[in-house]
């Protein structure tokens, strides 16, 4: 598993957007990745310094469409905190604001 395969996508919610002001970024990551591997991947991909990594395993949820039931697959979420002297991660690019 390469470092570029670990981070799948950023999680964009109201809470995660508010945490970006405190240099905390939320990503969906590979479920087999551990904290040290996530730290190495974020530092390599975004060229920043990571202070800490918190991980959460989100359980699968059951969903219904009419009479049919199915499951929405679970995933692993990582909240990455950057150091104070590190630069910000530009998720949306420069033209977003």
From Swiss-Prot:
Pfam families reported for this sequence: Ribosomal_L23
Keywords: Ribonucleoprotein, Ribosomal protein, RNA-binding, rRNA-binding
GO MF: rRNA binding; structural constituent of ribosome
Top-rank lineage group of the source organism: Bacteria
Gene Ontology CC terms, in alphabetical order: ribonucleoprotein complex; ribosome
Recorded family membership: Belongs to the universal ribosomal protein uL23 family.
Summary of the function given for this chain in its UniProt record: One of the early assembly proteins it binds 23S rRNA. One of the proteins that surrounds the polypeptide exit tunnel on the outside of the ribosome. Forms the main docking site for trigger factor binding to the ribosome.
HAMAP family (alphabetical): Ribosomal_uL23_B
Known partners and oligomeric status: Part of the 50S ribosomal subunit. Contacts protein L29, and trigger factor when it is bound to the ribosome.
PANTHER family: 60S RIBOSOMAL PROTEIN L23A
Annotated protein name in UniProt: Large ribosomal subunit protein uL23
Organism lineage: Bacteria, Bacillati, Bacillota, Bacilli, Lactobacillales
Gene name as annotated: rplW
């Amino acid at each position: 598993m390469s470092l570029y395969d670990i981070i799948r996508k950023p999680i964009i919610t109201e809470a995660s957007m508010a945490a970006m002001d405190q240099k905390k970024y939320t990503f969906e990551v590979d479920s087999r990745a551990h904290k040290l591997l996530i730290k190495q991947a974020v530092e390599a991909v975004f060229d920043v310094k990571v202070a800490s990594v918190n991980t959460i395993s989100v359980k699968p949820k059951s969903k219904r469409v009419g009479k049919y039931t199915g499951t929405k697959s679970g995933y692993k979420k990582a909240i990455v905190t950057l150091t104070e002297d590190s630069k910000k991660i530009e998720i949306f690019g420069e033209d977003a604001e």
